[in-house]
Each structure stands twice: as C-alpha cells, then as structure tokens.
C-alpha cells in the first residue's frame, strides 16, 4: 500500500523492526546510491513480479529469506555489486548468517539484520573481499590453535645438546 524496501510475507519482523529496517534501508540508499531490498516468504511468493515492482537493476541487492530450504538466505545481486564484493563474499555471507545454527541462535530476524549489517559495512568501506567480523567460535579456535602451536614449537625448539641454542631439526620436523 506504500513504497517500501521490505516485504515481510513470512512475518519475520515485528512491526517496530520492520519500520526501523525500512528507514535504515531508505537511508542507506540515499547516502550511498545502492538499493537494498528484503523479501521474506514462506508459502506465498511474488515470484519475478518483485523485480518490476522494485525496479531492480545492477545497483540493487535483493535479500530473500525463505526457511523452506537448507539455508534461510538467498541473494539476487546486481552486477555492479561484484566490483566491490566478489562472488565468494556472497557465498560466505549466506553460509555464515543463513545456516540453521545461526538462525537457531539469533532467529530469522537476527540472521537477516546481521547479513544486511555486513553488507552495509562493506558499502561504507567501498569494498570487501570477505565478510566483516569474526564469529566468537572462530576467534576462540584461532587463539587456541595459535597457543597450542606456540607450545609445540617451544618444546620442539628446546635445545637437546650442550652448546645448541635452538633445536632447528626438531622445530622444522614438528612445525606444520
């Protein structure tokens, strides 16, 4: 009934969330010139009519949230986006925020909002090769493996012969 960047057929968002999201997406479009649109669907889907309704072009991104598949998020990406964010970015974005574990922990609304937030960060920066932000689990895993690797290297490098400062042979043998 009014021009909107959000069509919430699946009722993923509360009225307040939808209103804030509409304002945010309109503001991003005014500020950057890039169109971001959100469609949530379940049983009912507008199909290809949505392209004409929103006038999607090469500077448009359509995020489709549909829980019927294995991944909540799908993206219809305008060609101009690929100059700033490669195809691998969109795959990473989909797998990070649309997987069933993330959706279970953050809800469908959180997954959509977080994915859009990552895109907005990249639009502000002007370019992204990878999705910004590091999940806590990945950060902890990286820290743990780094510390463990340091301990192994330290023990391996400990001199075994008198006059030797570093046991290079053992260090190289046990290094990854």
Model-inferred region functions:
Residues 148-175:
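Juxtamembrane interface at the cytosolic side of transmembrane helices
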């Amino acid at each position: 009934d009014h021009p909107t960047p959000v069509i919430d057929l699946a009722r993923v968002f509360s009225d307040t969330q939808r209103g804030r999201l509409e304002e945010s997406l309109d503001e991003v479009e005014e500020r950057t010139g890039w169109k971001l649109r959100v469609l949530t669907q379940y049983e009912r889907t507008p199909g290809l009519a949505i392209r004409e309704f929103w006038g999607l072009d090469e500077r448009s991104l359509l995020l489709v949230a549909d829980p019927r598949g294995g991944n909540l998020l799908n993206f219809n990406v305008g060609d101009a986006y690929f100059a700033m964010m490669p195809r691998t970015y969109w795959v990473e974005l989909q797998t990070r925020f649309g997987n069933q574990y993330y959706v279970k922990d953050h809800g469908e609304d959180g997954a959509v909002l977080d994915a859009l937030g990552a895109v907005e960060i990249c639009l502000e920066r002007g370019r992204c090769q990878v999705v910004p932000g590091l999940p806590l689990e990945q950060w902890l895993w990286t820290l743990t493996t780094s510390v463990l690797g340091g301990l192994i290297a330290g023990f391996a490098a400990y001199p075994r012969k008198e006059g030797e400062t570093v046991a290079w042979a053992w260090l190289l043998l046990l290094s990854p």
